[in-house]
Amino acid sequence: MAPIDSVLSSQLKNIQRTLNYHASNPIDVFIVNKAAEMKTEKVKKQPGSVSLLSGQIIINVHASTQDIASLFRKECAKILVEEMMYGGTFQDKVKTNNLISLPEWLIPGLQHYLAYDWSAETDNTMRYIHDQYGLTNFDAIPSIYNDVKGASFWKFVAYKYGPNAIPSVLYMARVTRKFNASVYYSFQVSANELFEDWQEFYDYGYLQDQKKPNPVNGVMLS
């Protein structure tokens, strides 16, 4: 178990550093031996103990180190971002969730970005979105691509404004309760201006890459 413990500890530190936020409650991780137990495992707690988290992280011990790390990052990101945005208790989450207005792609996109960074698969999907739908209207991209288009937003702001851009947007979103306001107070530009820059960033990248064969499953064709 030592190698798994080392991997999880390292991944948690990386996510906390990216978000500039540390969980106020312990994150429970349970290792199971069979894939079926991923859905059926029931956690037995000691008498008098109460978990304030919305869920635990359950990992299949037989999965590859890469799969374990990706799953852990995704679930950790979900726990940390939800706590950061909505509070650590059930009462806080119910109260704050009704007050903060965020695009439906924002948080799932961040979870995807923190879990997989900018993987070949994510880039392939974003390239397809660019070719199929264009990037003129961010909101017109179908919602089935919320994870990827959201991840593309976070990748762009981190590239343009630096690593502190991610926690800045999240913090200002919680304070102002509005996405557009969080963008303005974080970067002193309007959301429309930011998405124009986002479009230019990806248009330029993919247009420069047009002469190269499209990758298939992350493998570049010769």
Give the positions of each predicted feature:
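Second-shell loop/turn segments in exported
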Residues: 1-3, 57-67, 95-101, 138-144, ...
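Zn2+-dependent metallopeptidase catalytic core
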Residues: 1-29, 73-76, 80-83
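Beta/coil-rich, acidic/histidine-enriched accessory regions frequently appended to metallopeptidases
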Residues: 7-10, 175-222
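Surface-exposed patches in mature extracellular/periplasmic domains of secreted proteins
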Residues: 14-30, 88-93, 124-127, 164-170
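Active-site-proximal alpha-helical
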Residues: 15, 105-106, 110, 114-121, ...
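Acidic helix-start/capping segments at beta-turn-to-alpha-helix junctions
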Residues: 23-40, 97-98
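Charged, often glycine-rich, active-site loop that binds/positions anionic groups
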Residues: 35-51
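Zinc-dependent metallopeptidase catalytic helix centered on the HExxH motif
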Residues: 49-121, 167
